[in-house]
């Protein structure tokens, strides 16, 4: 909204927020709370969707589907995750014994180890990829490629978060010295695993007519959506059959 000041917030009809663990500080219908804090009028509805890693993408799916069906013309799809405040699995996980027997509650790191074994992906290959990834991210920040995407966040006057803290200058010697993070004989370490992060993002989605009438820059067009399931032990492969 800050980048599109010509938009009247009263035009926003719905806000759908993706969140993998909507409890604790992320609970109590966080989508509506986000809308209120953003100054969006009370006429805007709010809903939280949980599809774990695909939660925010599902928010995009739902808003775009509402627009395509003619239910609304303008909505916000957003996502948030505070992995510092809400632990993996939530505060009081209660595992179903039959699901536990089927390894339904397997962690993401362990699923990645399964895929690495399937694909014969070595630790060295993962570390090489990680180094390249960090270098690309650092270069992108240096070249201000995220200048129009990242908005500084004021932490209650104590500090100002202006950039992603994840990318760092790779230290290959330190990377090679790390112990496996998930399996004793595994290949994935803290240097090649997903970080524990806090982050949020949001996009404005409108009908083409609405965008043209309000002189909004169209950055992308949603042509279709697809979801599909995979063996939960191979969850990292989910996007592949969905894309196909």
Predicted segments with their positions:
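Glycine- and Gly-Pro-enriched alpha-helical subdomains that act as flexible
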Residues: 206-244
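Flexible glycine-/small-residue-enriched beta->alpha junction loops
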Residues: 68-119
């Amino acid at each position: 909204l800050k980048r599109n000041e010509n938009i009247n917030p009263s035009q926003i009809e719905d806000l759908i927020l993706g969140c993998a663990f909507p409890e604790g500080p992320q609970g109590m219908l966080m989508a509506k709370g986000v809308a209120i804090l953003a100054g969006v009028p009370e006429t805007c509805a709010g809903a939280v969707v949980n599809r774990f890693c695909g939660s925010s993408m599902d928010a995009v799916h739902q808003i775009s589907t509402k627009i395509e069906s003619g239910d609304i013309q303008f909505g916000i799809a957003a996502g948030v995750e505070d992995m510092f405040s809400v632990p993996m699995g939530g505060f009081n996980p209660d595992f179903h014994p039959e699901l536990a027997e089927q390894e339904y509650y397997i962690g993401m790191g362990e699923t990645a180890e399964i895929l690495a074994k399937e694909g014969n992906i070595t630790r060295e290959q993962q570390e090489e990829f990680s180094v390249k990834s960090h270098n690309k991210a650092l270069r992108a920040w240096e070249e201000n490629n995220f200048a129009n995407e990242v908005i500084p966040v004021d932490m209650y006057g104590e500090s100002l978060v202006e950039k992603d803290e994840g990318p760092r200058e790779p230290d290959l010697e330190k990377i090679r010295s790390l112990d496996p993070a998930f399996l004793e004989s595994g290949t994935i370490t803290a240097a090649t695993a997903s970080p524990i992060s806090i982050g949020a993002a949001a996009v404005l989605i409108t009908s083409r007519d609405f965008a043209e009438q309000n002189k909004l820059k169209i950055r992308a067009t949603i042509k279709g959506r697809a979801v599909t399931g995979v063996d939960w032990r191979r969850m990292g492969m989910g996007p592949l059959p969905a894309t196909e």
